[in-house]
């Protein structure tokens, strides 16, 4: 009997550990790699030329009145990758009339009427939450943005 319970607990532990979904998206020039893990939290990390520059960092939101909070125990329904190579007309005058807009975009479509969009450019990476909530207004109580930089890294803050 004890052996059956032990085997059952091991099987449950393996199933739970497999639950975490991992996604990777690269910059168009393949120098920047963004890794995303959707488990108890939404975690991202960034590598540049194979060297880790952002260690695993959590991102999440707390929206008033929602049962499912973006980034907390995320359930990814679908993942979509788009490669964009376009030119935008410069609104603010710069040397060139147009600005090249080239990036790889990963959209994680999640249960709970929200998506997380990651964009990886040749010179950086960004994310944003996108909702399709029908309630109005939407009140964001808080947003968690961890930026766990590597030791010895310098950051310039405005």
Name every feature range the model reports, one short phrase each:
Residues 22-158:
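N-terminal accessory beta-strand-rich subdomains and adjacent acidic, glycine-rich linkers
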């Amino acid at each position: 009997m004890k052996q059956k319970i032990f085997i059952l607990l091991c099987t449950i532990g393996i199933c739970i550990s497999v639950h975490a979904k991992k996604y990777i998206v690269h910059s168009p020039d393949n120098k920047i790699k963004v890794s995303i893990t959707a488990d108890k939290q939404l975690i991202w990390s960034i590598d540049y030329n194979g060297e880790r520059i952002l260690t695993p960092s959590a991102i999440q939101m707390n929206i008033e009145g929602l049962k499912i909070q973006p980034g907390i125990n995320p359930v990814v329904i679908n993942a979509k990758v788009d490669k964009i190579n376009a030119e935008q007309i410069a609104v603010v005058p710069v040397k060139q009339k147009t600005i090249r807009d080239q990036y790889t975009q990963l959209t994680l479509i999640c249960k709970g009427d929200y998506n997380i969009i990651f964009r990886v450019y040749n010179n950086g990476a960004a994310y944003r939450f996108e909702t399709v909530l029908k309630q109005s207004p939407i009140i964001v109580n808080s947003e968690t943005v961890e930026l766990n930089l590597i030791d010895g890294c310098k950051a310039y803050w405005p």
